[in-house]
Amino acid sequence: KNFDLSFQMTGQFGFKILNEPRAYYENNSIAYNRLKSVQKAPYGGQYTLSTAQKQTFVSYYLEDGDFLKMTNITLGYNIPLKSSKFVKNIRAYVSADNLFCITGYDGLDPEMSNGDIWSLGIDWRDKYPSTRSFTFGLNVSF
């Protein structure tokens, strides 16, 4: 009876993302820090270390970017008060941001961008994932 719930979801559908971190770390021309998935190379199964960087254009690293995110959810409780001269209302709440993301994308976050409008649809490496945060609060009205 005294509870309230609000949530916000965001999503995008029908687009592709270039998974640049996978393309970089699965590159068989570098000898360091390679992913095990390099064994599934898109270049005809060449698993050996090569000194020449492959300049072939392939769609191997294009992935479906569809996602649905729980951007925010808040659950609150209005604490019933007996008549008080000073306090009119007290509400306690808990809130979560970026609680979950439903996606088939292999990267960190299908919504990531480096802020450059010319590189939309490219997930650049060396990015931090979106933070997940939890907030507990108390609203008091006088």
Label the model's feature ranges.
Residues 5-7, 90-94, 136:
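Transmembrane beta-strands of outer-membrane beta-barrel proteins
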Residues 2-5, 82-83:
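Repeated loop/turn-to-beta-strand initiation elements of outer-membrane beta-barrel proteins
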Residues 1, 70-75, 132-138:
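Hydrophobic, lipid-facing positions within transmembrane beta-strands of outer-membrane proteins
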Residues 3, 14, 76, 121-122, ...:
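Glycine-centered flexibility motif
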